[in-house]
């Protein structure tokens, strides 16, 4: 609503609109802080040797965060794994994603794709039952006109596209 029309509204309605807007902003700030705190808690798992329950927690958190980010941007959101994340962590999380989506179906196929060529020095993601290089996936999505955003996981941070300030180191 333009400011020109806003100034002509009754005082009570203007106050209600301002109050509702501020309430939405406070909710958004609270949620961003909660996401930041959760990222901080989960980033510590990237440096240690996490237990199976911690891996499950990390996987569930990243999936929930990807769903939320996807809804906020009204597009597909994937988890981009940087090269510096230990292989055992990223592949366990991707395996957990696969199990949630497909059960034990095609688990052998997923295991074979863990062995990416050593000359491939690219970030990877899990998409539709496969582990793929992000650069190849970006080219494919661009050619198809599909917009995608990423949650980037590296050895010492989890970055979201929600707010550039939510970079946890």
Swiss-Prot record:
<protein>
    <recommendedName>
        <fullName>Cell cycle link protein</fullName>
    </recommendedName>
</protein>
<comment type="function">
    <text>Interacts with and disrupts the function of host retinoblastoma-related proteins RBR, which are key regulators of the cell cycle. Induces transcriptional activation of E2F-regulated S-phase and G2/M-phase-specific genes. Inactivation of the ability of RBR to arrest the cell cycle leads to the stimulation of viral DNA replication.</text>
</comment>
<comment type="similarity">
    <text>Belongs to the nanovirus Clink protein family.</text>
</comment>
<keyword id="KW-0945">Host-virus interaction</keyword>
<comment type="subunit">
    <text>Interacts with host SKP1. Interacts (via LXCXE domain) with host retinoblastoma-related protein 1 (RBR1). Interacts (via LXCXE domain) with retinoblastoma-related proteins (RBR).</text>
</comment>
<feature type="short sequence motif" description="LXCXE motif, interaction with host RBR">
    <location>
        <begin position="110"/>
        <end position="114"/>
    </location>
</feature>
<feature type="region of interest" description="Binding to host SKP1 protein">
    <location>
        <begin position="9"/>
        <end position="22"/>
    </location>
</feature>
